[in-house]
């Protein structure tokens, strides 16, 4: 009987899958880490889904490397690859301790070059003044991005029904993230005339153009300014200018960053006044 139990235990060790190993390891490891760290492990595990149902004794070096190679093909960052390697390393170290596996190949994985991330650049006051001087529909779009902090996708999805002219604010109904949906952004007094004109001149969407068309004109205007900005630099500029003067919670609310329980977001007159006060700090 004892010999049978030993054989059965060995067989179970030989058939445990990577998914089963993860589900066994995470509850133990999560006792000493933050919720955000637990979430990052779940995200990393999704990248190894191709081998997650394989018995760990059948997973060799090339299986690991193929996971990393696949991430490169998808254009994922060095940081993402490193997080996956870290997770695999922890899992197989745990497997060795539990006598499920005898080899950890992760230290030999090649992650590829660590290419620096894009350095965002802030629009200068001189560049913003030149945008006002250019005075075209596309320079107006860039100014609206600068004074609202909207993502370009959010701007292109704005409809007339999202603009509350009497109260002088807009509502973002189509956002990149759930945290950004339904947020209120007061309209700065300098861009209110631009919004009013768009409201009068359009039928449904404020900007009836594609991203490709806008991107082309954006690059043309950047040439006029003799600078190399990306569209996202407008949002970065908005955040940077307000970061030093606006309360952190107010800035997160304007940018649509997650804070607390987003399902219970309630705007009061006081909240909107605080948002407007922050927006008007922009010059």
Which positions does each model-derived feature cover?
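Major-groove DNA-contacting interfaces characterized by cationic-aromatic clusters
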Residues: 57, 102-103, 166, 171-173, ...
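N-terminal core-binding DNA-recognition domain of tyrosine site-specific recombinases/integrases
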Residues: 14-18, 26-94, 98-100, 208-212, ...
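Catalytic-site neighborhood detector that most strongly recognizes the C-terminal catalytic loop/helix
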Residues: 16, 176-178, 192, 248, ...
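Conserved tyrosine-mediated DNA breakage-rejoining catalytic core shared by Y-recombinases
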Residues: 148, 157-195
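N-terminal helical hairpins
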Residues: 1-15, 31
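Basic, Lys/Arg- and aromatic-enriched nucleic-acid-binding interface segment
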Residues: 82, 97, 101-103, 107-152, ...
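Short, basic (Lys/Arg/His-rich) helix/loop patches that form interaction surfaces
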Residues: 133, 185, 199-208, 215-260, ...
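C-terminal secondary-structure termini that scaffold catalytic or DNA-interacting sites
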Residues: 11, 167, 197, 201, ...
């Amino acid at each position: 009987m004892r010999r049978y139990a030993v054989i059965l235990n060995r067989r179970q060790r030989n058939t445990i899958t990577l998914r089963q190993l993860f589900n066994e390891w995470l509850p133990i490891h999560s006792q000493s880490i933050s919720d955000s760290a637990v979430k990052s492990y779940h995200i990393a595990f999704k990248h190894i889904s191709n081998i997650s149902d394989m018995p760990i004794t059948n997973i060799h070096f090339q299986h690991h490397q193929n996971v990393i190679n696949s991430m490169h093909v998808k254009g994922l960052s060095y940081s993402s690859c490193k997080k996956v390697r870290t997770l695999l390393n922890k899992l197989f170290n745990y497997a060795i301790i539990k006598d499920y596996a005898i080899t950890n190949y992760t230290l030999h994985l090649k992650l590829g070059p660590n290419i620096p991330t894009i350095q965002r650049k802030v629009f200068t006051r001189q560049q913003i003044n030149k945008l006002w001087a250019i005075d075209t529909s596309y320079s107006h779009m860039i100014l609206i991005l600068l004074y609202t902090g909207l993502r370009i996708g959010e701007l292109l999805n704005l409809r007339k029904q999202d603009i509350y002219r009497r109260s002088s604010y807009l509502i973002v109904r189509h956002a990149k993230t759930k945290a950004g949906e339904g947020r209120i952004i007061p309209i700065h007094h300098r861009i209110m005339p631009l919004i009013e004109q768009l409201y009068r001149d359009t039928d449904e969407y404020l900007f009836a153009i594609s991203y490709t068309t806008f991107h082309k004109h954006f690059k043309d205007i950047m040439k006029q300014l003799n600078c190399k900005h990306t569209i996202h630099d407008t949002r970065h500029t908005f955040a940077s200018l307000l970061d030093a003067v606006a309360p952190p919670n107010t800035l997160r609310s304007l940018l649509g960053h997650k804070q607390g329980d987003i399902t219970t977001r309630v705007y009061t007159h006081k909240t909107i006044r605080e948002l407007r006060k922050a927006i008007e700090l922009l010059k």
